[in-house]
């Protein structure tokens, strides 16, 4: 930049030779030149008619040693004495690696002409876009994508593109080069994947600074079968009105048919971030023929909120749960963002120049919105002062023409709505101030370009008006207007419009071509004499359409009809010749889940429009400002020069009609106008420019050298516009939740079952190579077979023409269905050995009733009513135009993907259907993650520059047998360099800035969050993320808390909850600490107050040995954090030391004994330090000692850690965060930076944003520690690491090279083996290796151990009459009893109840519990979000510690659910979240359980016929030998029944094997008693008696190997006969039977089975 400045000075000194006869020569170029791109420039001669040749050069800057481009052009009268040569800057000649801006010199020389202009360069050589096949994926699925690349002329390019995939945490997990014209392999998501929004980022290989991002979500989901749409009667709730609020409900199946069912509707109000439901609004609404309507009555709203005016500024929401008539499927939709307002409109100024020409018309574009930001149509508006009226169009805009007076320098403008139904005080109003255009040298010459048309589209002829005003002499010199049209950052066209003498208005017609999409700038100027230029410009929006053509339609009328699954059909593509067309067909159910990320023409134009280098909506401060703001660089032969551009991107481009741009344009103009001084206004405007480095306002202000006044104006405007931007980032509140069951359709009887149900398919690329027709359009027919889904497919085509850019066609829909079909509903996954109910819904869309037979096909992977030997069938009628749900109960026995198949046929007809789908079965147990973080730092931790280590495998003693272990090893370079800024988002701290209230303790609890949030945001410079105006509010809250705390300050400067209580050492120290921190932010906090508390602590609570004592514990023990536990003396002393140290900078001069007090206390702590037991106390003490400069050895501290990254105690999350924060502070104070990285990473990974009650200390410490880290941590070194990972059973190690350029890309390797592996690292810098081990752990017996609460939950059936039932089908009474297990009653306590699916709480019961004089509960809230189950939250003022507190209320079942998951009840302390207990409840479903037999984690289905004790009279010896010697029979025994036990619903018969008649798998059958397992239901049929002998044999498949033994299953294939004892064999009745048994034994024992 220094060279740049010298060059400009030299240029000004040398000057440029002008024409000898008074001509004016101009050179105009784009303000930014793109490399490797042809750019048009303009050279013009005014007042010179002599033909001449001009040489055009492009040189390097500043030395001009290289000629990068050269050409010659002829200028003559035939060309109106202007030329538009094309130049091109080759990137290969430049230093691309330079991090500084690069410029070139554009030079024009010729007779009497010498012009030069320095122009900024950009390496953006084109546009690149990514299309993914859909916008949402499940773990493990492939992400198909294609890349489209065009240059700035919208011509197709096949340059190599780098495509990266980034996790929601911003980690690059894949980066590879792709060729846009070639085949691209999909990116396969791993099974172990981060849920959330992922990014696919595309950028050119040689210009990575410009990128395009496609987004997609990753989560577990199933597709719905129908969608629900809500349409409120108004977009707002007008507070003064008396009308009820109506919401229309529309429900449609995805194949177009209307849904019959019922909707449950509840309204609520969202206040800040909290949803407050209106219990009385819960209504059951029938959905008839797909439609219903919900109503919120004003009285219902007042029943929840008595003063409706308090709701102004908040939003209404409505949650609707629609359940189909069969109860088989459910979709939840929520519509939010319905603003509660006093005025229903807001006004913005958009597409309005900031500058006006005095005495000329000023075109003011007003944009009126509803409160949700949507355009408000047909609203009258009026401007005051200069009167003008208009009415908004359908897009919310109205154009007002203001006739401005002469001789004014500023124009105050006020516009208000003029709606006839609103009183004046309720009308919306908006003001701005426009500034007068400054003429050159005060000449008073003006040009106003006016375009009055509103919606402009290709093919239009656009009238452009040139209005001039000036003195007569000047006007007589105007012979023509030169105009330039800029599009996509390039000069698209240059022309001249003649003017005749005396014309003050000249009009030309401009033909709009597709090349001018999406918008263009029209810049015009005229010259007066040889030195004055008068200019104006206007920005023009063009309707978003394709530049070319692309249409998708059915190849014939037959193809446009409703199709059958699997049918053949054809589509026809029509488009530009040579276009490559990418196709994809997507199930519309995917868009019900997520349609945010679909590629569209509008999104493409939005991206391309960013290449516009113009920065305003038109006009300019003066003639040069017109060119600058339009994105042009100008120089003239009379030294008229635009300012040098220093950034390619505009601080605020004039986006098209969008609310965010409206807000910013309007806000910037009005804010800057507040500064009358031109210099300060410039400082303000610069403050509102966006910083490309992302610096904070404060950091940017450090670079200002123009004085304090400029710096103050800069900061004020910078903070102001940041707050506006934050408001504009409000996300849409309309979202759709999904059913818990999948949406695709399955098969039937003897027909091949439908089994192909992709979410997207037809991923093809077709080229239009056919001969074009007379309209220049090529076509191609594409044949294909439809998939098996019954749905509507949306076929999306994106074409890339060689010359006309990208075109996204209107989607073509293909509806697939038939009159009779099955919809098989499967969950996303089920747990092995757990029963689940699935449903097949049979639809009959025929006009006649039918009779059907349905069958569940047997699969040995499931236990079901369908068995190998017996098919499970049901037969029933289905009425015309209706459906019927058929439930099937199954128990999955094997993990993995297994087929579920249902078939159905119609009696007497050929109609049938079959569906086969995969069901994912996951292992039992609790999915556990073990994370180990290892820092690789070979220069510090290595030997000879190499760090080698062996990573020991985790001990997984609790792993579920026969389940896989997945280990993922990720390596990331220098992970801590920017971790705070990237991971702790300041915008999420909004909830911490609250109003303090309550007693001396509660006030500190509620004041602390504002203090620590301000401390953290100040330290990290993140106020922009939260909104700069929030800092003022935070300071106000701090001062409120400070003032209130003074009420509880005693005369001796100590504190207690109330002044009549004894003073608390801990509370006084805490007040000292918080006020000391706050005093750095608020100067009004008295140092005397802080130091008074310090003095009281030292003189009244410190013992001679240095320890601090507590004589009066606080009431709110939860605010103590971890200090509340064991080792109280050490933790209290350490805590008070940290408070004294915090106050040292304030009180050291006032309190002479402060340092000696700290020394005494730290002497005591040093004696205790190595003997401490708790990790928390060790961390706290280490910080106190390190902060006092008494500790520099971290060995004891690190020994107390878990994994060297956290200080952890069981079941105490907030204490662990607090303790780890103390440890981080200690490490920072000791400057042990090598140990810091993993600790910071762990804290960040907790995603902990703090809270108030019960979280005070964790909140304070985590943000204090992270802020301190941001301040202290030295900048990271250059990175150049080579890492090798040798995994077991792999011969070749994984090798990675990590440097600064690729540090953020994660290198990941996975293995299924949980074994030791070795790692080697060498080089410079640091990297973090994260080992994530995921496995299924057996549930611990104490998994539900409760902390500080006892809880009992039960349900019982309730008989109700018709009135009491309230439309429900049944009811239960939920009984909850809890007791606090502390020494005193628990104060504020919350009971959070998760409802059973299909059940709603009885609001009247809850009201009775809360409204009576004997109030059992403080208040309750109901959230009937059926997607996540409804919830009831109950607030209790206290819970007794001496007796149970019980609550009973009814819950009503409103619809049937096939398999009800348990509900849960959680009780927890409002003040301490670690004190909690959770229990589950479920209606009794014992008789509905399928029978299965389990040993360990292996289960066998037992849902078959019982084995019957063989008592047939006609069984002879030969039959027994034949049966015993059958192929699959494994053994034949004589046994004695020793005992019978019952376990898990099964009978276990312990048999002693007396004789092995035929040996089998069990080689030691007689070693000990053998277990025979049978279902309980077979007990009576078997009728086995103790001490009786039995002949028994069974199949090999009925043997069950155990760890050191074998068990035997008794199934229908087991043969059992009673063997009479010796005495009975003497009886005539049993003699023949005993002889047969003896002969059977001898035959098989001696001779074996006959062959």
Swiss-Prot record:
Region (C3a-like domain): 660-738
Disulphide bond pairs: 546-807, 615-650, 683-710, 684-717, 697-718, 863-1501, 1091-1147, 1346-1477, 1377-1446, 1494-1499, 1506-1578, 1525-1649, 1625-1634
Numbered residues of crosslink Isoglutamyl cysteine thioester (Cys-Gln): 999-1002
GO-annotated biological processes: complement activation, alternative pathway; complement activation, classical pathway; inflammatory response
Record organism: Naja naja (Indian cobra)
Protein name per Swiss-Prot or TrEMBL: Complement C3
GO cellular component: extracellular space
Residue ranges annotated for the Anaphylatoxin-like domain, each copy included: 683-718
Organism lineage: Eukaryota, Metazoa, Chordata, Craniata, Vertebrata
SMART domains: A2M, A2M_N_2, A2M_recep, ANATO, C345C, Thiol-ester_cl
Quaternary structure and partners: In absence of complement activation, the C3 precursor is first processed by the removal of 4 Arg residues, forming two chains, beta and alpha, linked by a disulfide bond.
